[in-house]
């Protein structure tokens, strides 16, 4: 394998943020996640590592373990060769669900976590409309105010 300088830099950023924790958590569950989203209803416990949110918004040990701590980490997650495509695939599956609100699809409070996650990624990936499409479809275009506050103060 030829390692380019750009690839090396991306991997250093990825390693610095320990994104492997997300890859590891997803490895055994990703097929189940896809299946649940295709069926239009989340039933498992995976929201934290599929749709991560900014640090400080979740209070459980799992939420803290999978919290995104900076804009740079969120950008690295979105650009990661495994996590980025999986994130977009899952958002596409959610966005393709017709006739159901996000609370029915994800349950509560996971509907709030999804909004927070979409807000975070929309802010760090402004050229990628998939995040704002989800906000538009399920939240009337209203971003999560707490996530925006955390991003402003970080």
Regions found by a protein language model. Name each.
Residues 34, 75, 118-119, 136:
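Amphipathic alpha-helical segments within well-ordered protein domains
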Residues 36-71:
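Hydrophobic/aromatic-rich, well-ordered segments within soluble, folded domains that form packed cores
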Residues 56-62, 122-131:
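Short helix-capping/linker segments at secondary-structure and domain boundaries
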Residues 126-154:
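Charged phosphate-binding loop/patch that engages nucleotide di/tri-phosphates or the phosphate backbone
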Residues 67-86, 138, 145, 153-154:
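C-terminal end-helix/capping segment
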Residues 76-121, 125:
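Mid-chain, well-packed structural core segment of small domains
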Residues 3-31:
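Extreme N-terminal tail/first-helix region
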Residues 23-36, 94-102:
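Short amphipathic alpha-helical segments and their helix-coil junctions
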């Amino acid at each position: 394998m030829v390692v380019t300088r750009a690839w090396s830099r991306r991997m250093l950023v990825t390693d610095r943020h320990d994104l492997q924790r997300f890859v590891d958590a997803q490895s055994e569950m990703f097929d189940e996640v896809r299946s649940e989203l295709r069926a239009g209803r989340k039933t498992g416990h995976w929201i934290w590592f599929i749709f991560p949110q900014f640090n400080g918004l979740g209070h459980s040990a799992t939420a803290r373990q999978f919290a995104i701590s900076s804009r740079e980490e969120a950008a690295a997650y979105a650009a990661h060769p495994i996590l980025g495509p999986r994130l977009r695939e899952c958002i596409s599956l959610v966005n393709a669900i017709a006739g159901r609100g996000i609370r029915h699809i994800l349950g509560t409070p996971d509907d709030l976590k999804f909004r927070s996650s979409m807000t975070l990624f929309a802010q760090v990936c402004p050229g990628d409309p998939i995040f704002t499409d989800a906000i538009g479809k399920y939240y009337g275009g209203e971003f999560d105010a707490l996530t925006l506050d955390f991003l402003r103060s970080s």
